[in-house]
Amino acid sequence: MSEPASIALQKEIVRELEVAETFDAEREIERRVAFLAERLTSTGLRALVLGISGGVDSTTAGRLCQLAVERARAAGHEALFYAMRLPHGVQADEDDAQQALSFIRPDRVLTVDIKPASDAALDALLAADVAFRDPHHQDFVHGNIKARQRMIAQYAVAGAHGGLVVGTDHAAEAVSGFFTKFGDGAADVVPLTGLTKRRVRAVGDALGAPAALVRKVPTADLETLDPGKADEDALGVTYEEIDDFLEGKPVTEQVFETIVTRYRQTDHKRRLPIAP
C-alpha cells in the first residue's frame, strides 16, 4: 500500500472511532459524566449498571458512573449506580476488584457467580453432541459464553431497576475487535468511546484511581486453559502501538498491517446485524 493511501486509511479509521486530535483528562471527565447524567434525566431511567473486574477500564468507567448518578440526584432525579461483581467461581485477582470498588464507592454492589450458568450451558452443548475442534477451541467458546453470561446478568439487573447497562469499550478495543460480540460488546451506553488505552489510563489517573489498577496489565481472562493471558499477547501488538496508530502517529509497517487486518476481520462486531 502506498504511503498516501495508508495514511488516508489510518485517518479514516481514526475518524470512525471518534478519536480526538487533542485530549484533556479533566475535560473528558466532565463531558462523559455529563453525558451519563443527561441520559438518565432525559429518559427517566433510574440506574446505571456495570460489571467491575478490577481492570483500568471498568474502574474508570465505574467512577464516572458514580459521579453521574450523584449529579443526577443533585438535579432532583432518582438514580443509583449498581456495580456488579461477576466472577466465574473464584477470581484470581479478586483483591484488585475489591480495591476498584473501594475507589469507586458505588451506591450498590451486587455479586453474581456466573460459573453455574456458564458451565451448565457448555454441558448442555456437549450433551447435544456439539463437537469442538480441540480442547482449546472448546475453551474459547466457553470463554465467550462467560462474557455473554455476564451481560445477561447485567441486563437482568438493569431490567429490575429501570436502568442502563454501561459498557467499557474504547477506541483501542474497538479497532482491534477485542471484545465478545453480544458479551462485553453489548451495552446501552459506552462512556469511554473514542479514548485510546493511554487516555483511559489518564482519565483514571485524573479521577484518582489506584496506580496499581491504572497500570495493571490488561487481560480478558476468559480462557481456563490460558488463564491471565495478556491482551497484548493475544493481539500481536502492544496497546502503545495501537494508541500511536489511533492518535495519528507513525507506526511500523508490521504494526500497521496487524491493526488494519484485525480492524477489517472484526468489522461485523461494530455493525448492526446484516440484512438483505
From Swiss-Prot:
Keyword annotations from UniProtKB, A to Z: ATP-binding, Ligase, Magnesium, Metal-binding, NAD, Nucleotide-binding
A GO BP annotation: NAD biosynthetic process
Pfam families documented for this protein: NAD_synthase
UniProt keyword annotation of ATP-binding present: yes
Keyword set includes ATP-binding: yes
GO cellular component terms, A-Z: cytoplasm
Binding site for Mg(2+): D57, E173
List of residues binding deamido-NAD(+): R148, K181, D188, H268, K269
Xref: InterPro entries: NAD/GMP_synthase (IPR022310), NAD_synthase (IPR003694), NH(3)-dep_NAD(+)_synth (IPR022926), Rossmann-like_a/b/a_fold (IPR014729)
Enzyme Commission no: 6.3.1.5
Broadest EC class assigned to this enzyme: ligase
Recorded GO MF terms: ATP binding; glutaminase activity; metal ion binding; NAD+ synthase (glutamine-hydrolyzing) activity; NAD+ synthase activity
Catalyzed reactions per annotation: deamido-NAD(+) + NH4(+) + ATP = AMP + diphosphate + NAD(+) + H(+)
Coiled-coil regions listed: none
Annotated ATP binding sites: G51, I52, S53, G54, G55, V56, D57, S58, T168, K197, T219
Pathway in which the depicted protein is active: Cofactor biosynthesis; NAD(+) biosynthesis; NAD(+) from deamido-NAD(+) (ammonia route): step 1/1
Oligomer status and interactors: Homodimer.
Biological function: Catalyzes the ATP-dependent amidation of deamido-NAD to form NAD. Uses ammonia as a nitrogen source.
Record PANTHER family: NH 3 /GLUTAMINE-DEPENDENT NAD + SYNTHETASE, NH(3)-DEPENDENT NAD(+) SYNTHETASE
Family designation: Belongs to the NAD synthetase family.
The protein's name: NH(3)-dependent NAD(+) synthetase
Native source species: Streptomyces coelicolor (strain ATCC BAA-471 / A3(2) / M145)
